[in-house]
Amino acid sequence: ATFHQVGFQDYVDYDFAILNRRERRTMMTHPHSNKYSYTFDDPEYRGIFYDKWEFDRVFSEYLGRDWMMVTDDNVDELRAFGEAHPVLITKKQAGRSGAAINRYYSTEIEDWADFHAQLRERGELLIEENIVQHPDVAAVCAGTVNSTRVAAFFDGEKTHILAMAQKFGRGQAADQMDFGGFYTMLDPETGASLGDGYDSHGHVHKL
C-alpha cells in the first residue's frame, strides 16, 4: 500500500491483484486523489466542502431544497418543518461515505420535543428537505438520492471533466457503497452509461 499509494478499497475496486506494474500506475487511488486535492484546492475555501453545515449556508440559493438548523429552543420550527416535509434528512457537521446522514419520516415522530433533544444529543443539527428526483432516475433505485459525480480540474482558465459516474443507492439514506450502493461510469460527452454497475463487494448490477 505504501509503495503504490493504494488503499484497501482501491486494491479491491481496481482489481490490483491482476494488474501489471504499468497498469497500476494509471490508477487514481484515494491517496493520490487526496494529494492532488490538497495541492490544488484553494485552502481559503477547502473547508466549506468538508463542513456540511457551512456548505448549505454558502450555497443555499443553489440547493433547490429547504433546510434548517436545530438550535437550543426551536422545537416549534422543527415541527413546522416536519409538517411541511414528510421525509427529513439530517446531517452531522462532518463525515464521509454517508456516515453523517440519516433519514426520518415525519409521520413516525410522536414527540417533537424528544426528537429535537435526540438530534441535538447526536449532533444531527442540519435538517434538509428530501430531494425528489426525476422519475427515470428514481426508477432504478427508489428511496435514495442517486447522485451524479463529476471529477473536474480547473487549470486557471478552463475546467476539464476528468471522469463522470452515476451512483445508485439501495433504498438507504445515502447512495454510498457503505450503504450497499453501486456505480456505473458515464461518457463525459454523452452522459450515457459505459457499462454495468459495480459495488464494493464484487457484485455486478445490470443496467
Tell me what each language-model feature is:
Residues A1-E61:
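Low-complexity, highly charged intrinsically disordered N-terminal segments
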Residues A1-Q5, I18-M28, K92-Q93, Q166-Y183:
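Charged, low-complexity, helix/coiled-coil-prone segments
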Residues T2-G7, N102, A192, K206-L207:
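Proteins with a high burden of low-complexity, intrinsically disordered sequence enriched in S/T/G/P/A and R
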Residues H4, H30-H32, H85, H116, ...:
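Histidine (H) residue identity feature
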Residues D15-S33, R79-A100, G197-G202:
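Short N-terminal signal/transit or membrane-insertion segments
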Residues N20, Y104-S106, D187:
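Short, solvent-exposed coil/turn linker segments
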Residues K35-G156:
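Active-site nucleotide/adenylate-binding loops and adjacent lid/helix of ATP-dependent enzymes
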Residues C141, V145-L207:
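ATP-dependent carboxylate/phosphate-activation module, predominantly the ATP-grasp catalytic core
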